[in-house]
Amino acid sequence: VRKRTAGTVAVLGATGKTGRYLVARLCERGYDVAAIGRDRARLEALDERARPVVADLEAPATVKAALAGAERVASLAHARHAQALIDALPAGCARVVVTGSTRRFTRLPDPAAEAVRAGEAAFARAGLPGVMLHPSMIYGAPDDRNVNRLLRLVRARRVIPLPDGGRHRVQPVFVDDVVEAYVAALERETAPGPPIVIAGPEPITYAAMVRACAEALDRRVAIVPLPAGALIAAARVARALGIALPFDADEIRRATEDKVFDPGEMRERLGVSPRPFAEGLRLKCARGWC
């Protein structure tokens, strides 16, 4: 029998790349955790201290039942589900944390970014006691997509082609820091208010990320610049001809847009200081996830 010491927290999206670590961290802190997701088998593989609860944001009645009695709610589901979550919240819920994305700041035409902006607007209109977090590129989990792709590339090739030589900047954030940000957003009195960006401490170029991955694997690589415009044109031609490429034109466009953010609110309102990319990558590899 679990001893409830810190209150009840419901976590939606509990089986995702970040959700499963948040569930474990909240259990460590003594919460009675309702881990909510669509797949019972995956839910039952989470921290055994959590209660698996099957629900689907596309089926509002199931979510309302899953959230009944929750004192705090953290949703790691896509921001397009914000209104469904708002409608399902129990009366008297003391804190709500929802997930957006720094993709909402893009200047490129992007339906995914529009969905995040719409979710942010819905959450703001609701006037709930809580906050929306906008994570940047999250890395560090065993199955993180972006960094694992770079690690595979570095293992397979000595010469790495990058759009514009990889000079464009991103600000990846380590998964442990993301989890601590969610915990703080659930607990700290300074958390509620405008959305908070969850990002690494400073921008890093794609080229520097590749070199850090090579160093972590004790490999030497050479980076070859490829004009982004030519890659976009090639992707368009390949698509028209039905040829599958490992990238599409939209991916190249996004890769040439600097993604630079100020993590000041993350530090000030949440008390979380994100670690540099190289440090997070070392931790990922030390855990055997490289």
List the model feature ranges, each with a label:
Residues 124-141, 151-153:
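Conserved beta-loop-beta element that borders a ligand/cofactor-binding pocket
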Residues 40, 72, 83-126, 130-132:
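Conserved Rossmann-fold NAD(P)-dependent oxidoreductase catalytic core, especially the SDR/UDP-sugar
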Residues 9-29:
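N-terminal Rossmann NAD(P)H-binding glycine-rich loop of SDR-like oxidoreductase domains
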Residues 185-247, 263-264, 268-290:
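Mid/C-terminal beta-alpha module of Rossmann-like enzyme folds, strongest
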Residues 36-40, 57, 77:
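N-terminal Rossmann-fold cofactor-binding loop
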Residues 54-75:
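Conserved Rossmann-fold cofactor-binding substructure of NAD(P)-dependent oxidoreductases
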Residues 152-173, 177, 181-185, 189-192, ...:
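A conserved pocket-lining segment of Rossmann-fold NAD(P)-dependent short-chain dehydrogenase/reductase
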Residues 132, 141, 166, 171-179, ...:
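Conserved loop-to-helix N-cap of the C-terminal "lid" that shapes the substrate pocket in Rossmann-like
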